[in-house]
Amino acid sequence: MTGTSILQFPVLSEGVLLKRYKRFLADVELKDGQVVTVHCANTGPMKGVLHPGGRVRVRHAPSPKRKLAWTWEQAEIPSSDGTLCWAGINTALPNKLIRALIEAGGLKDQLGPIKTIRAEVPYGLNRRSRIDLLLTPDDSADDQRPIYVEVKNTTWSHGDVALFPDTVTERGQKHLEELTALLPDARGVLVPCLSRPDVIAFAPGDSADPRYGDLFRQAMAAGVEVLPCCFSFYEDQIQWEGVRTVCPRL
């Protein structure tokens, strides 16, 4: 399935990033010279993908329910081999992307045949958390345990190794603990969504969040599965590049 288009969409508009500010906002100059303020769904530091003066792709989606008619979707970044590549920076997209990948059978070898997929299902202590995806195995599957999938958008890298997180994330720490607590009655699966095509492996971002790194290794030792899923980004689609290897420590 490598190279298969997983998501398609209307052609994005290209421009140049002028600045990002107030976490949620960025100014972009489009090719026609128009300067627009776009919504930035990624509220983190965006290490490695925030390059004022660099090329970006934005989506025009005006709606009475939205304050801004534009959304920042992709950024052109230096790749691990010294060339340039496109990265997906919209953190609202990975859950949809991974769901589409599972529905297309892209993770059948790792997850087995799947009968149903549910999103944002309550779980965890007092059911106060919501799992990104809850999978019910098909009746033909050897392992009939429910599969809890937590998705993390990943754009930071060191060389050709993708890293998550790029800042301290107490929420991410909690998710690792909750996935571990599901075992052995269910399968806990962490899916780093590698939103850049130039990486060959994934590791926890210990330098940004040492506790997350420790919890990551504890979770793996306990049986939590890690499936780093890599994608390449185009102006009108996102393609599947395969599952990458896991490095418990960089």
UniProtKB/Swiss-Prot annotation:
This is Sugar fermentation stimulation protein homolog. It comes from Synechococcus sp. (strain CC9311). HAMAP family: SfsA. GO terms for molecular function: DNA binding. CDD domains: SfsA-like_bacterial (cd22359). It comes from the Bacteria. Pfam families: SfsA, SfsA_N. Belongs to the SfsA family. Gene3D superfamilies: 2.40.50.580, 3.40.1350.60.
